[in-house]
Amino acid sequence: LGQREEPRRAQPRDGELGEAVERAQDGDEAAFAVAYRIVQPGLLGYLRGLVGDDAEDVASDAWLEIARDLGRFKGDGAGFRGWTATIARHRALDHLRRRRVRPRSSALEQDVLDLPGPHNTHDQALEAMSTEQALRLVGGLPQDQAEAVLLRVVVGLDGPAAARVLGKRPGAVRTAAYRGLKRLATRLGAEGVTDEAPRTLGESK
């Protein structure tokens, strides 16, 4: 696929997030609220891709666990995003098992590992979409590709972090994410994206 390993993609507020988490671990409730406000939008978008309308309830359960286990977390702001995504994913899968429903995009699991840098056509295609449009289109991808795209674009994880969330090898996650983003770009008629849109996507309207 010609992909290159990329350095970790820092999110704009990761520094602020890391500081807030550190203060929250020392008992600062206002700092925990700051961390929540930074992380919650992406986490909720990820959960919507997994459990649909039940995302808010699952997110509430996840945050209870995050608050309870906060003292055990070690890492920076980017690490906290990955840690919270892992907890949210476990709660989502528990929820789906209880309901005995298959994940809408079970492989909403994969990520986006080491994709080409932040300004490539695939990212631009997704950035042009609203969250609602993105989730609708992502829901039409194969499961592994869908979750990979959600972790990269909605949660904002880098490749290695997404691989840890999913318990998969970086290479497998990287490939799934690349293919998922390429399919989405092709569906959107993104300029400069050619060829191999897999048939699965081409068949859906």
Where are each of the predicted segments found?
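C-terminal edge and immediately downstream basic/flexible tail or linker adjoining helix-turn-helix-like DNA-binding
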Residues: 2, 23, 164-165, 181-205
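A short, charge-rich alpha-helical start-of-domain segment used by transcription regulators
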Residues: 21-45, 67, 134, 146
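Sigma70-family region 2
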Residues: 25-26, 49-53, 61-80, 98-100
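Short, charged helix-capping/linker segments at alpha-helix termini
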Residues: 25-34, 44-61, 170
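Hydrophobic-face residues of short alpha-helical interaction/recognition segments
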Residues: 43, 47, 70, 84, ...
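Structural recognition of an alpha-helix C-terminal capping motif at a helix-to-coil junction
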Residues: 57-64, 78-90, 175
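Short, basic/polar amphipathic helix motif occurring as a linker/hinge flanking DNA-binding modules
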Residues: 95-118, 125, 195-196
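Helix-turn-helix DNA-binding module
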Residues: 136-147, 155-172
